[in-house]
């Protein structure tokens, strides 16, 4: 469920309907994922899931799997 929603957000932010993020996907794997796109993606994630990330969390995940785990923890609290 989280992964599907992240894919929907990524497709919108990166304007690529064929984009599929996996748990091992990193920013470097996605064409156009630069610092500005990262900010747009993360703000969109915060809005979609109704969560807020700390500064460290905002930039501290290695791959989509890390982001998914972080979101799951936030949604449980």
Question: Residues of each region from the PLM?
Answer:
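Phosphopantetheine-dependent thiolation modules in NRPS/PKS and related acyl-activating systems
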Residues: 1-32, 37-77
